[in-house]
Amino acid sequence: DVVQVMEFLHVPRAVILGFSDGANVALETASCYPGRVSAVVAVSGNALPRGMSAASLMEVKLKYALWRGLEKVPLPRGVRERAVKSRQLLGLMARWPRLDKEKLSCIQAPVLILTGRRDMIRPRHSLWMGEQIPDSKVVFVKGADHFTLLKKEKAYGAHIMAWLRQRGL
């Protein structure tokens, strides 16, 4: 989808910034379309479902089972639609992304991985991602959790802009 939007807008190459699942999409795009990506900023992303903390992954799987079960019983229309959408989202989180060592090592663009030690993505997983991507930098934002980007966008923006300037982008 990212490359299709770029084609529609006549954008040959781009710096792609993604948050959470958007970070996963950005990394997948860089892996599959290396010629289209100048750089990636991946905020609170994961390469594999097991990159989530055990508690977060368990919560996702339990909620998935709950919503899946609710789809099988008679429900009012609005509740049924919510059950379907919730199950789809949680199923995505439980099974995707699938960016293994091979896919990450194919990324040619420089990558900035921003995360926090209190993120639902395990810090060790973020470091592992950085080890697999040839030109990457992992930055732990002090005191950050999964949603800190949405609360302290200026602090994240400063990290991002400094890194982009350093890379000449």
Predicted regions and their residues:
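Conserved acidic catalytic loop of the alpha/beta-hydrolase fold
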Residues: 1-14
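Conserved hydrolase catalytic core segment
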Residues: 12-51
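A catalytic-pocket lid/entrance helix-loop region that shapes and gates access to the active site
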Residues: 53-72
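Active-site nucleophile elbow and catalytic-triad environment of alpha/beta-hydrolase enzymes
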Residues: 87-103, 109
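Short beta-strand/loop motif that positions the catalytic acidic residue
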Residues: 107, 113-115
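Conserved alpha/beta-hydrolase "acid-adjacent" motif
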Residues: 120-125
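Catalytic active-site module of serine/aspartate enzymes centered on a nucleophile-bearing elbow/loop
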Residues: 136, 140-169
